[in-house]
């Protein structure tokens, strides 16, 4: 009896219980996360959803949408390892999925590892070459190029964005400032 009480207080029972609760709450948390009318999840709920999704994906590893969701949650929580791994799985399962590729590229470019940054930049270059009219891709590509001190590439991407954005778009002023800053480098 003493051993059981001691284990419940100091052992991994509490962690197992938290994992079981997260797994049980996953359907409700997922429904809330996907419902634009529902109250947004707080950080603790997002962490529980990530744990529950990770558990689900162990049994349903081919679920591209599940990996994408886990990648997004990893980005929101600032968990680079979770985000990068989840997006890598989504890309591996569906190499033509633009959301997976863009999420993976973003996770790689935000990494503290220079090799990840380089790989993210390469992936973004491929995405831009496939579709040079996607503002999200161009924006992330320009940011990545600027961070890696490839200023001519950043300017080219921002100039392409200016051609695509309407005259009154508020983003134009930010892009124009970014171009001037890159040209000064």
Residues of each region from the PLM?
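Alpha-helical adaptor scaffolds
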Residues: 33-42, 46, 64, 68-76, ...
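Register position in tetratricopeptide repeats
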Residues: 76, 110-113, 147, 181-185
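TPR/TPR-like alpha-solenoid repeats
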Residues: 73, 107, 144, 164, ...
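Alpha-solenoid helical repeat scaffolds
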Residues: 51-54, 88, 125, 159
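Structural marker of alpha-solenoid helical repeat scaffolds
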Residues: 59, 93, 130-131, 164, ...
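Long, contiguous interaction/recruitment modules in multidomain scaffold/adaptor proteins
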Residues: 1-51
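TPR/TPR-like (Sel1-like) alpha-helical repeat modules
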Residues: 91, 146, 151-169, 177-180
């Amino acid at each position: 009896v003493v051993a059981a009480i001691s284990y419940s207080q100091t052992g991994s029972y509490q962690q197992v219980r938290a994992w079981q609760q997260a797994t049980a709450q996953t359907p409700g948390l997922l429904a809330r996360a996907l419902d634009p009318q529902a109250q947004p999840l707080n950080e603790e709920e997002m962490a529980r959803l990530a744990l529950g999704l990770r558990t689900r994906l162990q049994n349903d590893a081919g679920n591209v949408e599940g990996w994408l969701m886990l990648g997004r949650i990893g980005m929101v929580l600032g968990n680079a390892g979770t985000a990068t791994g989840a997006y890598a799985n989504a890309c591996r399962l569906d190499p033509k999925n633009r959301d997976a590729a863009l999420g993976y590229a973003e996770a790689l470019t935000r990494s503290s590892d220079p090799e990840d940054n380089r790989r993210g930049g390469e992936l973004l270059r491929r995405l831009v070459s496939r579709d040079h009219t996607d503002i999200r891709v161009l924006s992330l590509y320009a940011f990545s190029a600027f961070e890696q001190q490839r200023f001519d590439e950043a300017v080219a991407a921002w100039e392409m964005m200016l051609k695509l954005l309407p005259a009154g778009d508020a983003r134009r002023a930010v892009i124009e400032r970014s171009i001037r800053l890159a040209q000064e480098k």
